[in-house]
Amino acid sequence: MPFHKNHLMYALLLVISLSIIIPVLFNGGALRDRLSEKTAKALVLSCIDFRFVNDKVSFFNSIGFRDDYNKFSLAGASLGYNQTQFPEWRETCNKHIELAMQLHDINEVIVMDHMDCGAYRILYDSPSMSRQEEYELHKKNLNKFKTMINQKFPALTVTTHLMDVDGSVMS
């Protein structure tokens, strides 16, 4: 039987596939170990704004949370939780916190707001609020969020952060 390039390609694919599948099937390899972990450090609540995704990941990696937190998003983050126009947002967030406690044994809730937040302009009906006005509203909402979560989930630590438009964390 003559040798074909296809035989070599199939053999190579088989070897590569088996080298990936066998360790997973026999409880070896990093993937199996990672999938068996049942804990996470925290649930992180942040805004839905796509502009800050990479900056948030970089920040959480830098403080030791790489691949070690549950992610939850609400428009406005702390404001999304505190506002009254959509009360189901708060209840949904609370249910996710409860679930993260049960599934992943979290011991912390972290909320990260960001400056230049469209949800703040819309929910406060203030399209031209100043940077200082927005900053003060963030601080107010972050503090209110912390108080409310501490009351509802006293066993959890609550940490608040505010990201600036350049990706730096202000607090």
Task: Name these PLM-found stretches.
Residues 1-3:
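N-terminal secretory signal peptides that target proteins for export/translocation
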Residues 57-64:
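Short Gly/aromatic-enriched secondary-structure transition segments
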